[in-house]
Amino acid sequence: TGGKSYTCTECGKGFIKKSRLVTHMKIHTGETHFICTECGKGFSQKGILQTHMKTHTGEKPFTCTECGKNFAQITTLLRHLTIHTGEKPFSCTECGKHFAHKGHLVSHMKTHTGEKPFTCTECGKHFAQKGHLVSHMKTHTGEKPFTCTECGKNFAQKTNLLCHLKIHTGEKPFTCTECGDKFAKKNNLLRHLKIHTGEKPFTCTECGKAFTLKGSLVGHMKIHTGEKPFSCTQCGKNFTQKNSLLCHLTMHTGEKPFTCTECGKGFALKGNLVLHTKIHTGEKPFSCTQCGKNFAQKNSLLRHLKIHTREKPFTYSECGKKYSQIVNLASHMKIH
Protein backbone atom coordinates (compact mmCIF):
# COMPACT_ATOMS: atom_id res chain seq x y z
CA THR A 1 0.00 0.00 0.00
CA GLY A 2 1.31 3.43 -1.01
CA GLY A 3 4.52 1.95 -2.44
CA LYS A 4 5.26 -0.13 0.67
CA SER A 5 5.63 -3.60 -0.87
CA TYR A 6 7.25 -5.33 2.13
CA THR A 7 4.78 -6.14 4.92
CA CYS A 8 5.44 -7.51 8.41
CA THR A 9 3.47 -10.75 8.89
CA GLU A 10 3.36 -10.15 12.66
CA CYS A 11 1.80 -6.69 12.88
CA GLY A 12 0.97 -5.69 9.28
CA LYS A 13 3.33 -2.71 9.15
CA GLY A 14 4.55 -1.87 5.62
CA PHE A 15 8.06 -0.98 4.44
CA ILE A 16 9.53 0.40 1.20
CA LYS A 17 12.78 -1.56 1.56
CA LYS A 18 13.27 -5.22 2.43
CA SER A 19 16.24 -4.34 4.67
CA ARG A 20 13.99 -2.19 6.86
CA LEU A 21 11.49 -5.04 7.19
CA VAL A 22 14.33 -7.38 8.24
CA THR A 23 15.46 -4.85 10.86
CA HIS A 24 11.88 -4.36 12.06
CA MET A 25 11.31 -8.13 12.49
CA LYS A 26 13.92 -8.16 15.28
CA ILE A 27 11.38 -6.34 17.46
CA HIS A 28 9.12 -9.41 17.29
CA THR A 29 11.88 -12.05 17.53
CA GLY A 30 13.56 -10.30 20.45
CA GLU A 31 16.94 -10.54 18.71
CA THR A 32 19.50 -8.25 20.37
CA HIS A 33 22.96 -8.06 18.76
CA PHE A 34 23.84 -4.62 20.11
CA ILE A 35 24.66 -4.52 23.84
CA CYS A 36 25.14 -1.41 26.00
CA THR A 37 28.56 -1.62 27.72
CA GLU A 38 27.29 0.59 30.57
CA CYS A 39 24.23 -1.35 31.75
CA GLY A 40 24.16 -4.53 29.65
CA LYS A 41 20.82 -3.78 27.99
CA GLY A 42 20.41 -5.36 24.53
CA PHE A 43 19.01 -3.75 21.36
CA SER A 44 17.95 -5.04 17.95
CA GLN A 45 19.37 -2.06 16.05
CA LYS A 46 22.66 -0.13 16.30
CA GLY A 47 20.86 3.21 15.99
CA ILE A 48 18.67 2.42 18.99
CA LEU A 49 21.76 1.52 21.04
CA GLN A 50 23.42 4.81 20.08
CA THR A 51 20.32 6.72 21.15
CA HIS A 52 20.18 4.75 24.41
CA MET A 53 23.83 5.59 25.21
CA LYS A 54 22.82 9.24 25.56
CA THR A 55 20.91 8.33 28.73
CA HIS A 56 24.30 7.49 30.28
CA THR A 57 26.27 10.43 28.83
CA GLY A 58 23.49 12.95 29.47
CA GLU A 59 23.93 14.32 25.94
CA LYS A 60 20.92 16.33 24.68
CA PRO A 61 21.93 17.91 21.36
CA PHE A 62 18.41 18.73 20.09
CA THR A 63 16.92 22.01 21.36
CA CYS A 64 13.37 23.34 21.09
CA THR A 65 13.44 26.83 19.56
CA GLU A 66 10.17 27.71 21.32
CA CYS A 67 11.06 27.05 24.97
CA GLY A 68 14.73 26.05 24.96
CA LYS A 69 14.17 22.53 26.31
CA ASN A 70 16.84 20.01 25.24
CA PHE A 71 16.33 16.44 24.05
CA ALA A 72 18.53 13.39 23.49
CA GLN A 73 16.63 12.32 20.35
CA ILE A 74 15.31 14.31 17.38
CA THR A 75 12.11 12.22 17.38
CA THR A 76 11.49 13.25 21.00
CA LEU A 77 11.98 16.91 20.01
CA LEU A 78 9.53 16.54 17.11
CA ARG A 79 6.93 15.00 19.46
CA HIS A 80 7.53 17.82 21.96
CA LEU A 81 6.97 20.50 19.29
CA THR A 82 3.33 19.42 18.92
CA ILE A 83 2.76 20.87 22.42
CA HIS A 84 3.51 24.33 20.99
CA THR A 85 1.73 23.88 17.65
CA GLY A 86 -1.27 21.98 19.06
CA GLU A 87 -1.12 19.77 15.96
CA LYS A 88 -3.00 16.45 16.21
CA PRO A 89 -2.81 14.86 12.76
CA PHE A 90 -3.72 11.29 13.76
CA SER A 91 -7.46 10.55 14.02
CA CYS A 92 -9.26 7.51 15.40
CA THR A 93 -11.64 6.08 12.77
CA GLU A 94 -13.88 4.68 15.52
CA CYS A 95 -14.60 7.73 17.68
CA GLY A 96 -12.91 10.64 15.87
CA LYS A 97 -10.50 11.46 18.70
CA HIS A 98 -7.31 13.20 17.54
CA PHE A 99 -3.73 12.53 18.64
CA ALA A 100 -0.43 14.34 18.26
CA HIS A 101 1.54 11.09 17.90
CA LYS A 102 0.86 7.96 15.85
CA GLY A 103 1.95 5.79 18.77
CA HIS A 104 -0.76 7.33 20.96
CA LEU A 105 -3.37 6.57 18.29
CA VAL A 106 -2.18 2.95 18.03
CA SER A 107 -2.41 2.60 21.83
CA HIS A 108 -5.84 4.27 21.87
CA MET A 109 -7.22 1.89 19.21
CA LYS A 110 -6.76 -0.97 21.67
CA THR A 111 -9.50 0.56 23.83
CA HIS A 112 -11.91 -0.22 20.98
CA THR A 113 -10.53 -3.66 20.12
CA GLY A 114 -9.93 -4.68 23.75
CA GLU A 115 -6.55 -6.06 22.68
CA LYS A 116 -4.09 -6.62 25.55
CA PRO A 117 -1.14 -8.51 24.06
CA PHE A 118 1.37 -7.87 26.86
CA THR A 119 1.14 -10.29 29.80
CA CYS A 120 2.84 -10.16 33.21
CA THR A 121 4.69 -13.43 33.84
CA GLU A 122 4.34 -12.94 37.62
CA CYS A 123 0.57 -12.52 38.04
CA GLY A 124 -0.89 -13.04 34.55
CA LYS A 125 -2.34 -9.52 34.26
CA HIS A 126 -2.72 -8.29 30.66
CA PHE A 127 -1.86 -4.86 29.27
CA ALA A 128 -2.60 -2.99 26.04
CA GLN A 129 0.81 -1.30 25.98
CA LYS A 130 4.31 -2.64 26.62
CA GLY A 131 5.17 0.46 28.64
CA HIS A 132 2.30 -0.26 31.03
CA LEU A 133 3.57 -3.83 31.50
CA VAL A 134 7.12 -2.58 32.19
CA SER A 135 5.76 -0.12 34.77
CA HIS A 136 3.58 -2.83 36.34
CA MET A 137 6.51 -5.24 36.69
CA LYS A 138 8.11 -2.82 39.15
CA THR A 139 5.28 -3.56 41.60
CA HIS A 140 6.67 -7.11 41.80
CA THR A 141 10.36 -6.19 41.91
CA GLY A 142 9.89 -3.16 44.19
CA GLU A 143 12.25 -1.24 41.91
CA LYS A 144 12.11 2.56 42.27
CA PRO A 145 14.91 3.93 40.07
CA PHE A 146 13.66 7.52 39.80
CA THR A 147 14.72 9.76 42.70
CA CYS A 148 13.58 13.30 43.54
CA THR A 149 16.66 15.52 43.94
CA GLU A 150 14.69 17.86 46.24
CA CYS A 151 13.53 15.44 48.96
CA GLY A 152 15.03 12.05 48.06
CA LYS A 153 11.71 10.27 47.51
CA ASN A 154 11.92 7.35 45.05
CA PHE A 155 9.46 6.40 42.31
CA ALA A 156 8.90 3.34 40.15
CA GLN A 157 7.94 5.43 37.11
CA LYS A 158 9.46 8.58 35.62
CA THR A 159 5.99 10.09 35.05
CA ASN A 160 5.24 9.78 38.78
CA LEU A 161 8.50 11.59 39.58
CA LEU A 162 7.65 14.39 37.13
CA CYS A 163 4.21 14.80 38.72
CA HIS A 164 5.78 14.80 42.19
CA LEU A 165 8.29 17.52 41.23
CA LYS A 166 5.38 19.92 40.72
CA ILE A 167 4.87 19.84 44.50
CA HIS A 168 8.28 21.51 44.87
CA THR A 169 7.96 23.90 41.91
CA GLY A 170 4.31 24.75 42.56
CA GLU A 171 3.65 24.33 38.84
CA LYS A 172 -0.04 23.88 37.92
CA PRO A 173 -0.22 23.93 34.12
CA PHE A 174 -3.76 22.52 33.76
CA THR A 175 -6.54 25.11 34.11
CA CYS A 176 -10.30 24.56 34.35
CA THR A 177 -12.03 26.68 31.69
CA GLU A 178 -15.21 26.76 33.81
CA CYS A 179 -13.93 28.21 37.09
CA GLY A 180 -10.21 28.91 36.59
CA ASP A 181 -8.96 26.38 39.17
CA LYS A 182 -5.46 25.12 38.37
CA PHE A 183 -4.07 21.60 38.71
CA ALA A 184 -0.63 19.99 38.68
CA LYS A 185 -1.92 16.84 36.93
CA LYS A 186 -4.18 16.47 33.89
CA ASN A 187 -6.06 13.59 35.58
CA ASN A 188 -6.90 15.86 38.53
CA LEU A 189 -8.34 18.43 36.10
CA LEU A 190 -10.42 15.75 34.34
CA ARG A 191 -11.78 14.57 37.71
CA HIS A 192 -12.54 18.16 38.69
CA LEU A 193 -14.45 18.85 35.44
CA LYS A 194 -17.06 16.27 36.48
CA ILE A 195 -18.12 18.70 39.23
CA HIS A 196 -19.26 21.10 36.50
CA THR A 197 -20.78 18.47 34.19
CA GLY A 198 -22.48 16.60 37.05
CA GLU A 199 -21.27 13.33 35.52
CA LYS A 200 -21.44 10.40 37.97
CA PRO A 201 -20.60 7.24 36.01
CA PHE A 202 -19.80 5.01 39.01
CA THR A 203 -22.86 3.49 40.70
CA CYS A 204 -23.08 1.45 43.91
CA THR A 205 -24.73 -1.92 43.23
CA GLU A 206 -25.95 -2.08 46.85
CA CYS A 207 -27.86 1.19 47.22
CA GLY A 208 -27.74 2.84 43.78
CA LYS A 209 -25.78 5.90 44.91
CA ALA A 210 -23.72 7.39 42.06
CA PHE A 211 -20.22 8.86 42.26
CA THR A 212 -18.04 11.10 40.12
CA LEU A 213 -14.86 9.16 40.92
CA LYS A 214 -14.20 5.41 41.01
CA GLY A 215 -12.14 5.88 44.18
CA SER A 216 -15.14 7.47 45.90
CA LEU A 217 -17.28 4.45 44.99
CA VAL A 218 -14.61 2.05 46.31
CA GLY A 219 -14.50 4.02 49.57
CA HIS A 220 -18.31 4.09 49.79
CA MET A 221 -18.62 0.31 49.31
CA LYS A 222 -16.84 -0.17 52.65
CA ILE A 223 -19.92 1.29 54.34
CA HIS A 224 -21.84 -1.79 53.18
CA THR A 225 -19.06 -4.29 53.94
CA GLY A 226 -18.15 -2.66 57.28
CA GLU A 227 -14.49 -2.84 56.30
CA LYS A 228 -12.21 -0.41 58.21
CA PRO A 229 -8.65 -1.35 57.23
CA PHE A 230 -6.92 1.86 58.36
CA SER A 231 -6.04 2.01 62.09
CA CYS A 232 -4.75 4.92 64.18
CA THR A 233 -1.54 3.88 65.97
CA GLN A 234 -2.23 6.48 68.67
CA CYS A 235 -5.70 5.47 69.88
CA GLY A 236 -6.60 2.35 67.88
CA LYS A 237 -9.59 3.90 66.10
CA ASN A 238 -10.31 2.32 62.71
CA PHE A 239 -11.29 4.07 59.49
CA THR A 240 -12.83 3.08 56.19
CA GLN A 241 -10.62 5.39 54.14
CA LYS A 242 -6.95 6.37 54.39
CA ASN A 243 -7.81 10.07 54.02
CA SER A 244 -10.11 9.84 57.05
CA LEU A 245 -7.24 8.36 59.08
CA LEU A 246 -4.85 11.12 57.94
CA CYS A 247 -7.41 13.77 58.91
CA HIS A 248 -7.90 12.10 62.29
CA LEU A 249 -4.15 11.98 62.99
CA THR A 250 -3.98 15.78 63.03
CA MET A 251 -6.05 15.64 66.26
CA HIS A 252 -3.13 13.87 67.94
CA THR A 253 -0.31 15.88 66.36
CA GLY A 254 -2.04 19.27 66.44
CA GLU A 255 -0.44 19.90 63.06
CA LYS A 256 -1.93 22.72 60.97
CA PRO A 257 0.25 22.91 57.85
CA PHE A 258 -2.21 24.89 55.71
CA THR A 259 -2.12 28.64 56.43
CA CYS A 260 -4.38 31.40 55.11
CA THR A 261 -2.27 34.06 53.38
CA GLU A 262 -4.90 36.72 54.21
CA CYS A 263 -5.22 36.35 58.00
CA GLY A 264 -2.64 33.73 59.00
CA LYS A 265 -5.15 31.22 60.40
CA GLY A 266 -3.86 27.64 60.29
CA PHE A 267 -5.80 24.53 59.23
CA ALA A 268 -5.17 20.82 59.60
CA LEU A 269 -6.82 20.06 56.25
CA LYS A 270 -6.34 21.73 52.86
CA GLY A 271 -10.08 21.47 52.15
CA ASN A 272 -10.86 23.53 55.27
CA LEU A 273 -8.40 26.22 54.13
CA VAL A 274 -10.05 26.33 50.68
CA LEU A 275 -13.47 26.80 52.33
CA HIS A 276 -12.09 29.45 54.70
CA THR A 277 -10.58 31.58 51.90
CA LYS A 278 -14.10 32.13 50.55
CA ILE A 279 -14.74 34.32 53.60
CA HIS A 280 -12.11 36.74 52.26
CA THR A 281 -13.09 36.51 48.58
CA GLY A 282 -16.83 36.60 49.25
CA GLU A 283 -17.26 33.74 46.78
CA LYS A 284 -20.56 31.85 47.12
CA PRO A 285 -20.68 29.31 44.29
CA PHE A 286 -23.46 27.10 45.71
CA SER A 287 -27.00 28.34 44.92
CA CYS A 288 -30.35 27.13 46.23
CA THR A 289 -32.62 26.22 43.31
CA GLN A 290 -35.68 26.91 45.48
CA CYS A 291 -35.06 30.49 46.61
CA GLY A 292 -31.82 31.56 44.90
CA LYS A 293 -29.84 32.08 48.11
CA ASN A 294 -26.07 31.58 47.65
CA PHE A 295 -23.63 29.81 49.95
CA ALA A 296 -19.86 29.62 50.28
CA GLN A 297 -19.91 25.94 51.21
CA LYS A 298 -21.82 22.96 49.82
CA ASN A 299 -22.63 21.71 53.33
CA SER A 300 -24.25 25.06 54.16
CA LEU A 301 -26.45 24.73 51.07
CA LEU A 302 -27.44 21.16 52.03
CA ARG A 303 -28.38 22.34 55.55
CA HIS A 304 -30.38 25.22 54.08
CA LEU A 305 -32.32 22.91 51.73
CA LYS A 306 -33.86 21.19 54.76
CA ILE A 307 -35.84 24.40 55.35
CA HIS A 308 -37.60 23.79 52.02
CA THR A 309 -37.95 20.01 52.41
CA ARG A 310 -38.86 20.35 56.13
CA GLU A 311 -36.55 17.41 56.75
CA LYS A 312 -35.60 17.03 60.45
CA PRO A 313 -33.23 14.08 60.72
CA PHE A 314 -31.81 14.93 64.18
CA THR A 315 -33.97 13.66 67.07
CA TYR A 316 -33.41 14.06 70.81
CA SER A 317 -34.01 10.66 72.42
CA GLU A 318 -35.19 12.17 75.75
CA CYS A 319 -38.16 14.17 74.50
CA GLY A 320 -38.49 13.17 70.83
CA LYS A 321 -38.10 16.71 69.50
CA LYS A 322 -36.70 16.87 65.95
CA TYR A 323 -34.30 19.35 64.33
CA SER A 324 -33.11 20.04 60.80
CA GLN A 325 -29.57 20.85 61.97
CA ILE A 326 -27.34 19.09 64.50
CA VAL A 327 -26.26 22.41 66.07
CA ASN A 328 -29.89 23.14 66.98
CA LEU A 329 -30.19 19.69 68.57
CA ALA A 330 -27.00 20.34 70.56
CA SER A 331 -28.42 23.68 71.82
CA HIS A 332 -31.67 21.98 72.83
CA MET A 333 -29.82 19.24 74.73
CA LYS A 334 -28.25 21.89 77.00
CA ILE A 335 -31.75 22.79 78.23
CA HIS A 336 -32.16 19.23 79.51
Swiss-Prot record:
Keyword Kinase found: no
Keyword line: DNA-binding, Metal-binding, Nucleus, Repeat, Transcription, Transcription regulation, Zinc, Zinc-finger
Matching Pfam families: zf-C2H2
Family: Belongs to the krueppel C2H2-type zinc-finger protein family.
Protein's recorded name: Gastrula zinc finger protein XlCGF57.1
Annotated GO MF terms: DNA-binding transcription repressor activity, RNA polymerase II-specific; RNA polymerase II cis-regulatory region sequence-specific DNA binding; zinc ion binding
GO biological process, alphabetically ordered: negative regulation of transcription by RNA polymerase II; regulation of cytokine production; regulation of immune system process
Source organism: Xenopus laevis (African clawed frog)
GO cellular component, one term: nucleoplasm
Taxonomy of the source species: Eukaryota, Metazoa, Chordata, Craniata, Vertebrata
Stored InterPro entries: Znf_C2H2_sf (IPR036236), Znf_C2H2_type (IPR013087)
Zinc finger (C2H2-type): 6-28, 34-56, 62-84, 90-112, 118-140, 146-168, 174-196, 202-224, 230-252, 258-280, 286-308
UniProt function note: May be involved in transcriptional regulation.
Localisation per UniProt entry: Nucleus
Xref: SMART domains: ZnF_C2H2
